[in-house]
């Protein structure tokens, strides 16, 4: 099995506490509301939302994928960090066993810096190159920008 790690960092005008509430704690409700073309709905299959919880994310009509299941690995509201692992679904190809994600929001001026790490666990000796994950990164960044825009347009939300 191979392991390929990719890091990404971007900034937001929204401070970590508010962004974490929208981007992590209430994402299952907010994203289908503001971007139904991306995510149709999210449901908890087992657990209470904390570590060990299994969620099923059903993608919207415009997506190339139908669904994924992920397991919450850690969530820390005090440090604004979140980790989960994609464990099932058509986004996992026959060459990828699982994908683990880590995100941490750090205060930066009056906003945030979002640091994310993706770990691709491949089957056999399959190699994953950064250009293979570029489209997914761009979609995730676009979704993040929608959340940020929503928070700017709704200054009383998630305070």
Swiss-Prot record:
One GO biological process term: defense response
Coiled-coil ranges (or none): none
CDD domains found in the cross-reference section: Bet_v1-like
Lineage: Eukaryota, Viridiplantae, Streptophyta, Embryophyta, Tracheophyta
Record family assignment: Belongs to the BetVI family.
Recorded GO MF terms: abscisic acid binding; protein phosphatase inhibitor activity; signaling receptor activity
Protein name: Major allergen Pyr c 1
Top-rank taxon: Eukaryota
Organism: Pyrus communis
The entry's keywords: Allergen, Pathogenesis-related protein, Plant defense
Any one cellular-component term (Gene Ontology): nucleus
InterPro entries recorded: Bet_v_I/MLP, Bet_v_I_allergen, Plant_def-hormone_signal, START-like_dom_sf
